[in-house]
Amino acid sequence: PDYGWGQGTQEDFYNIAGELRKNPRFDHIRISGGNTLNCDQALPWYNALKDRLDEGNTHQLAGSFDNFAQFFTTVREDGKHATADELHNVMEAMVGMEYGMQTGVWWGPAEYARGEFCKASHGERLAYAEHRPNWTAASVYRAPDGKVQAFGGTSERQAVTTSYRFLSKERDVFFDGHGPQREYVMELPGGEPGSYQDGQTNAEQVVSITWGDDVQPVVDGTYVLINKSSRKLLDNENGSLTSSTYSTGKKSLQWHVNPVDARIGGDFSYH
């Protein structure tokens, strides 16, 4: 339930949790609360219920960064399971993990940045930064397979445009093929300070960090797309997608692949 829609009071929630505890079917199922979309209200609800809870849970569609972070810290200090059951952006996952979140559930599709963060988060966090007034965060992880990636994200509804500078102290590296260089700036678009759902794009991104003799090139230009197995090329002749063999100068074999605009909406890691 959430308090904003008349779905019940704290007392109602407390009584329901008590009834669930009496039912043996729930012996091995975590009973969860606060469950508010406004993270400023999560702790008051959680604190009122916690002696009948196994899990503290919130998500972030309103409220302050301070209370979002403090919620997970408090739940862990109480010895309970910390959850965010409605992650709207990779930013919420990064912040949650930094302050104790143990379980997260994506709201909407787990696109590229989100999926890569899920894998990377089982590895080693190399760097983390946040801008609380702007509701943004960034991090660098080394995944279990050794892949190094930079992540950036924003609040779905409350972010302010923020730039993060990633610095390699040890070596020259390539950021999505750009390099060799020591620094890279990621700009995360948002709205005006103090605004709500005005100018927001729910922006998030993942950037590959590579070095050595075999690095990812910058993807931005005209390409032919080849099927590795058949050695056929993707052809768009007369508006119909077919496979073809290479022909010099045939325009229907040429594909323009360019980075999407950062304000496209959601994950802008794509082309």
Task: Report residues per predicted region.
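Lectin-like carbohydrate-binding module/patch detector with strong preference for beta-trefoil
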Residues: 215-271
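Substrate-binding and catalytic surfaces of secreted/luminal carbohydrate-active proteins
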Residues: 4-221
